[in-house]
Amino acid sequence: MKKKHLCLVLTLIFALLLGGCASGETADKYVGDLITSIKKEDPSSLSSFLEQGISDENETYVLQFPDELKDSYLKFLQASFNAVEFEINGAKKIDDERYSVQHTFTPLDIEATTKNTCEKYSPAISSTDLNAEMTKLLEKATEAVKSSPSYENSTQLTLEVKKSKDGYSLDDEQLQKLFSATMDNIMAPYDSVCEILDAQDYLTSCLNALFKNDVAEYAKHTGEDESSVQSQLESSMYAPPEELSASYTERYSAALKAICNNCQYSVGTPKKQDGLFNYIIDVTVTPNTSFQSAMNELETGTYYSEEEVDRALVELMEKYAAAPTYGAQTTVTVSLNFKTLSAAGAEDSEITSLIDTILPVE
């Protein structure tokens, strides 16, 4: 009888070790083990948290978060989560299927932690490749998290853990609650690069709309309808002179578009200034002197009727559209901010000066 009793006891103990709350697991131990696995193993549980951050950023900027950057950003978030120390204060039973587990921790402020790193990196941005630039920055930002983390005030958080016959679990809502409480300003490194490249993309899109007849990106930045932007260009930038004979207007506009399309410019990396949306940008320009060349040659000719002038003008425009002339390469520095944009159409504005340098008409 004693042997049977002993066997029964051993069987019960073994069943407890393997059963639902496996190996003597408790709600607080489950949460502790989960936190450790997130810190040390697969960071994929941070994916939903990152996706929410990405969604917010994609609404802010025209440039969209690169899919290929997600793995690097998840690893950065994992390193950030790893920098947070937790004290689990035990579990309280709510009912047969739920437990509350309280944590004490000091949240990591990612923006404060990476501020110096981002400020030092921003002037070194050398390409328009958002993924490449961010990948390099995240390596430096991860080192900052490991070496000099900046924390907020200590706080407490209570999570609700569910219990079933299969053991304990933490649903996605509770998991996001944990991540949101422990890591603040998670997209700060991304902001520091994307806002600069987005400003560069904006100025490039403005010039491309004017000179390349490419309005798609510009329309994204301004929220305007592409067809509306195109219509404005047709009635202003590419409009023929009023006195030009109707039989030549289409050829003139086509030639002018071709001349504009031959314009050469490259927008440099914006240098962030104090204040909201305030940048200094160097634009490398090789002036397209084709229009000037056409006008100069037109003035040297002799004509006996308005029709001859119109024909000569269009033929010269077509000539220099096919064989453009250029001046010496130069650099034009412009301010990009709300003030300069509001004055963009003024004759003495920096934007007007840039346009006149790209395609001199006088």
Model-identified regions with their sequence ranges:
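Solvent-exposed, well-ordered amphipathic alpha-helical segments
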Residues: T26, S45-L46, A91-Y99, L159-K165, ...
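Surface-exposed, charged secondary-structure patches
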Residues: E68-L138, S247-L313
